[in-house]
Amino acid sequence: MVFSSLTFLFLFFPLVMGVYYLCPRALRNLWLLLTSLLFYAWGEPVYIRLMAASILFNYLCGLGVAALQKREKKRLAKGLLILCIAGNIGALGLFKYADLLIGTVNNIAGSKIALLELALPIGISFYTFQALSYVIDVYRGTVAAQKNPITFGTYIALFPQLIAGPIVQYKTVEEQLSHRRETTAQFAAGIGRFTIGLGKKVLIANQVGALWDTVAALPGTSLSAGTAWLGAIAFTFQIYFDFSGYSDMAIGLGKMLGFEFLENFNYPYLSRSITEYWRRWHISLGTWFREYVYIPLGGNRCGLPRQILNLIIVWGLTGLWHGASWNFLLWGLYYGVILIIEKVWLQKPLQKAPGVVQRLYSLLLIILGWVIFALTDFGAIGNYFAALFGAHGGTDAQTMYLLTTNISLLLVAALACTRWPAHAANDLLARLPRAAQTLLRCLFYAAVLLMCVAFLVGDSYNPFLYFRF
């Protein structure tokens, strides 16, 4: 089940919210846990046992680590932590990376080891990282172990962020899990945030995604530069509005349930460097890798050679986290190398450059990076890059057709990547009486919702890209 589906909007969502607010406060976490497991089982019934096992395993590990720390048995606590990390990474590796490893060995050694062909459990990368952050923080003493299995299960399985994030660290919601207070204002803000996210997904991401699919289906060996750039720009818009739209919906649903999740995006395409970009894009993932991998490796506290090694490790892992294909590793290393270059050589020159140059530099590298991300075959990546830089001509009739039929959509997408729409709306509303502000907001959200429903009824194209990870 996805948020941008009629089943969720008109069946699951009203049922969950209605019963949630009718439940006594003491039973609300239990209701959320049960409905979150139902939400997960709707699309992955076979892996509901894996989810339950993950909850139980990490719950017991957290209690065990805390008990051993309290008794000052630090070596045993560390051993249990290592076991917990190995168990989580082992499960993730089995389902996500086993066939990649087997296929690579077969290609190199000429062997014929049978692939496992295990279906990837939806959201396993997200909920595994949440569980790991919890147990590591218990070991560090940052948070207390959660003794209530229902509360812990709710943290891991909470449906708004279960299958595509944001990656919610336990320490950011520890108090909210037990003592949240829902308010009318918070619920209203949640509806607005959810509706904006739904609009991003259905009205923009799905539409520009169709343009990317059209271009990606063309032979890369005869693609004109203009068409190739149109496709790459379309995918750049698609993945942003797809993923940030999902994050908006997750944050909005959280608000309706009394939770305040941290932001996951901050206008990343306005960045003036790649370093800044990764502070604005998928913030929860970057924070996770910084706190649980980069800093433990030494971070910036060691010499430059070690810092470079740390960055290569972190960005290689970041790439592989996104998928079981070598293009994701290449994509991660691509950014790792750029970040190293910026850190060592480009930081000061970039700061002195005009703002427009900084932004064009960043956007160019971001768009090229998404080409590596989108195409799993190295040969296809090479052909597409050749097309981008004019190997098969500049523009052709197809370029002009795709441009003229999609120009309005692309301009809307570009504008929606900026702060201007929010600033313009706020400036307009600030001039009106409070009652008029409320009325206009309600009318706007209703219009967006109606348009989304109309598109969902008539359009079968509704993928969430990050569900693959």
Residue ranges and their predicted role:
Residues 1-468:
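Membrane-embedded transmembrane alpha-helical bundles that form the catalytic cores
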